[in-house]
UniProtKB/Swiss-Prot annotation:
Keywords: Ribonucleoprotein, Ribosomal protein, RNA-binding, rRNA-binding. Pfam families: Ribosomal_S6. GO terms for biological process: translation. The keyword Nucleotide-binding does not apply. The keyword Ribonucleoprotein applies. It comes from the Bacteria. The lineage of its organism: Bacteria, Pseudomonadati, Pseudomonadota, Betaproteobacteria, Burkholderiales. The gene is rpsF. One of its GO terms (cellular component) is cytosolic small ribosomal subunit. This is Small ribosomal subunit protein bS6. One of its GO terms (molecular function) is small ribosomal subunit rRNA binding.
Amino acid sequence: MRHYEIILMIHPDQSEQVPAMLERYKGMITAGGGKVHRVEDWGRRQLVYMINKLAKAHYLCVNIEADQAVMAELEHAFKFNDAVLRHLTVLKKKADTGPSSMMKTVEREDARKTQQAEYQA
């Protein structure tokens, strides 16, 4: 089996359905004999350019270990899910289990926001 990193851009109006979507995709992976190594919810972020007249999207990063049949099934599910604006699948040499650089940035932004809120209070 190969290791993959999948980045998903979800429609911002569908943010509340993200956990259900994620569980469905994780179920597809484990049913096919794969493993989910890391799931990161990067939240809503500003887009560099507009996609389908949208300026923001909800980002997810998933690191998995799966075979080609499972990947084909996932790609098919991404294409026909209207809530998925874009998806990117990258083949990795090994499983990434630590936090990504993007997740470190998200955590740093959250810490800065809480610090500002405490300072203003």
